[in-house]
């Protein structure tokens, strides 16, 4: 997702993070509640850390690092996702063992945990000390669409940002690809994330919907 699309998707949160980056105050642990642009924001922030040709705090989106991060292949940005509907304790313990190490290509490391509410309780507990006392330049982004299912101890130790669904933004974007308003409203109603909306836009265009 391009930066202007992310700003349109979540203008308040985008501007807040621009200010945070400009002040050099990026926290080491965030909880992103809601999946409308949350993954895209985590990737944007990762690019801002690793981009080799930034314009101020803004990543270029074109350098090797930016492209690898977008493709989820950059070695210092680790993506964690559920397997069989659970994020196992063993996977998080492997993660914790990396926290005391420097990055491969930089001093930073970024960990993005998708559907973080699906972490086993022991897995979540194993992260508490690391969140409280990070031993290296690490940044952890917990992404969840069900904040209430996250352990209270995780919620209390992270900065929480809301990524609520922006129906009006979705409708506008769907209309931009040629959908009439009532069809745009219908697709916007059933799309649960910005990524899903983008896929729907492409499908709708190909099918002549």
Question: Which role does the model predict for each range below?
Answer:
Residues 25-26, 70-74, 104-107, 134-137:
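Short loop/turn elements that form and flank the Walker-type P-loop nucleotide-binding site
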Residues 79-80, 113, 163:
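Conserved beta-strand positions
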Residues 74, 92, 124, 147, ...:
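ATP/adenylate-binding site constellation spanning eukaryotic-like Ser/Thr protein kinases
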Residues 48, 52, 130-133:
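Active-site catalytic microenvironments for nucleophilic, acid-base chemistry
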Residues 110-112, 141:
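Structural motif
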Residues 1-48, 56, 65-68, 136-139, ...:
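Charged, glycine-rich active-site and insertion segments that engage polyanionic ligands
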Residues 59-88:
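AAA+/P-loop NTPase substrate/partner-engagement loops
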């Amino acid at each position: 997702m391009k930066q202007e699309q992310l700003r349109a998707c979540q203008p308040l949160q985008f501007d807040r993070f621009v200010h945070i980056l400009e002040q050099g105050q990026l926290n080491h642990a965030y909880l992103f509640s809601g999946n409308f642009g949350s993954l895209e924001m985590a990737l944007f922030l990762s690019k801002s850390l690793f981009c080799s040709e930034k314009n101020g705090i803004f990543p270029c989106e074109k350098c090797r690092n930016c492209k690898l991060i977008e493709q989820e292949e950059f070695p210092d940005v680790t993506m964690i996702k559920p397997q069989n509907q659970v994020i196992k304790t063993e996977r998080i313990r492997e993660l914790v063992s990396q926290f005391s190490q420097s990055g491969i290509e930089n001093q930073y490391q970024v960990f993005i945990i998708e559907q973080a509410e699906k972490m086993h309780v022991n897995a979540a507990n194993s992260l508490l000390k690391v969140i409280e006392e990070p031993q290296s330049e690490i940044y952890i982004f917990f992404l969840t669409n069900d904040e209430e299912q996250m352990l209270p101890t995780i919620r209390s130790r992270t900065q929480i940002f809301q990524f609520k669904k922006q129906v009006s933004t979705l409708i506008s974007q769907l209309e931009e690809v040629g959908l009439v308003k009532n069809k745009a409203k219908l697709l916007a109603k059933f799309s649960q994330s910005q990524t899903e909306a983008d896929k729907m836009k492409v499908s709708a265009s190909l099918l002549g919907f």
